[in-house]
């Protein structure tokens, strides 16, 4: 009886061990607000200023060359500046929870820390949204975010 049990158990163990040993890793799912997909053209994303000038955080995502996704938001702060940052906390980014807006604050969905909109994209390090560019380029009524800038936030979503 023990021999039959052992012979039935060995194939099951081998299947379970080797089924998870592929060379590809499964992408982790982003659990925060993904927002609108933005296609990259000529190594940049352009977003109409009038689409993001209402004081409400607008969430976006794109896929970098190679397929790595990045998630970000743009918000016009009370001081009148347009600000872009990763939708991932520099400390809690690995949780893939992102941020949400409460009035004039962005709130980390993981730790609950609040960040004034006027400070978004101005500070590196610590527990705040990772900055993309504190001086967003606006040309012909559009915001431009470059591939290199988006590569700078990639690590928060792997």
Language-model regions: role of each:
Residues 22-24:
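Bacterial signal peptide processing site
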Residues 26-99, 133-158:
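N-terminal pre-ligand scaffold of iron-sulfur
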Residues 11-12:
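Repetitive helical segments and hydrophobic/amphipathic motifs
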Residues 1-4:
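Positively charged n-region of N-terminal signal peptides that target proteins for export
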Residues 17-20:
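C-terminal motif of bacterial Sec signal peptides marking the signal peptidase cleavage site
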Residues 15, 83-86, 102-105:
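Processing junctions and N-termini across compartments
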Residues 103-112, 122-133:
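Short cysteine/histidine-rich metal-coordination sites, predominantly Zn2+-binding motifs
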């Amino acid at each position: 009886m023990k021999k039959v049990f052992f012979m039935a158990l060995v194939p099951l163990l081998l299947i379970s061990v080797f089924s998870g040993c592929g060379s590809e890793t499964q992408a982790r799912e982003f659990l925060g607000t993904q927002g609108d997909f933005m296609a990259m053209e000529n190594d940049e994303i352009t977003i109409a200023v009038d689409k993001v000038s209402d004081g409400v955080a607008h969430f976006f995502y794109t896929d970098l060359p190679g397929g790595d996704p990045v998630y970000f938001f743009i918000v016009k702060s009370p001081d009148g500046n347009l600000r872009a940052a990763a939708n991932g906390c520099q400390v809690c980014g690995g949780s893939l929870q992102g941020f949400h807006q409460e009035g004039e604050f962005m709130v980390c969905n993981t730790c609950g820390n609040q960040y004034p909109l006027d400070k978004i994209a101005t500070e590196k390090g610590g527990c705040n949204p990772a900055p993309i560019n504190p001086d967003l380029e606006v040309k012909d009524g559009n915001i431009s975010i470059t591939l290199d800038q988006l590569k700078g936030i990639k690590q928060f979503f792997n």
